[in-house]
Amino acid sequence: MIDDSYLDISDHDSFKSGVPHKTFERLRNEEPIFWTKEKNGRGFWSILRHGDILKVNQNYKVFSSERGIRIEDQTEEEYIARRTFQETDPPAHRNIRSLLNPAFSKQKMDEYENLVRKLASDIINQAIQNTKFEAVDKIAKKLPMMMLGRILGVPEDDLDWLVQKGDALIGNSDPDFSELIIDKEDSEKYRLMPFRSPAGADLFDYAEKIINGSVDISKEGILFQMLNNIKTSEGQPVMSDLEFKNFFCLLVAAGNDTTRYS
């Protein structure tokens, strides 16, 4: 699809050839606060200038995350079933992050340096055994996958499967990643799963196994810390099993994807 500056930004097909930069440039110049009508939805606002985005992000009382953060229309039941700590405002958001921060402190990150260097060296040495190779698959994808496994504390044998499911989860509009395309097929039976995706159901099942102890997680990983420290704080439950499952899906998908392309 050719970007003629007037593409429908609610249509996934508008992004088949990449981000439609000409369309976004025109909108920034002409309609930086833009309402998009949807064929099968209630529509959404786009805030397209950097300064405006900063103001929105800093004003959670007006631009709250508590009623959802997705363009997709959700019922109350769907929202509650798929809610993560991303759909919270201060102080709840801050409280959950404060419980997680020790696992991502500078001291903890410094401890990973030698491990990262060793993993990177091994992965590159293995890749260059071939005269030609796909750098994203053999290096950029593999390193964060291995590190994600160490940080989460999941078995190394499960990593390929977890990354595949994470890709399918956030790629639910891309046939290269997902077996079910969210706006092309009936996804009703997955409406209570993360991203309305069958991969979300698979990751929920895996998270349930972590909770009941049938997946052997490392005591050095953050999942072990979460189950022992985050679910209960001062005798009060902080994170339910459902919230843990949703948070696990978030860690698998976002933790791997954002690191791979950075």
Please provide the spans of the model-predicted regions.
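Short runs of predominantly hydrophobic/aromatic residues within well-ordered alpha helices
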Residues: 20, 53, 140-141, 145, ...
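Amphipathic alpha-helical interface segments
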Residues: 196, 200-205, 209, 219-231
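Central I-helix of cytochrome P450 enzymes
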Residues: 141, 194-204, 232-262
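Contiguous, well-ordered alpha-helical segments that form the cores/surfaces of helical PPI scaffolds
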Residues: 145-150, 224-231, 246-249
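Short, glycine- and charge-enriched coil/turn segments that flank and shape catalytic ligand pockets
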Residues: 128-132, 216-218, 232-238
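Short, well-structured alpha-helical segments
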Residues: 117-120, 163, 223-224, 244-245, ...
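Active-site substrate-recognition loop segments, prototypically the cytochrome P450 B′-helix/B-C loop
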Residues: 1-136, 145-200, 209
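Proline-centered turn/helix-capping motifs that create local helix->coil transitions or kinks
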Residues: 155-156, 211-220
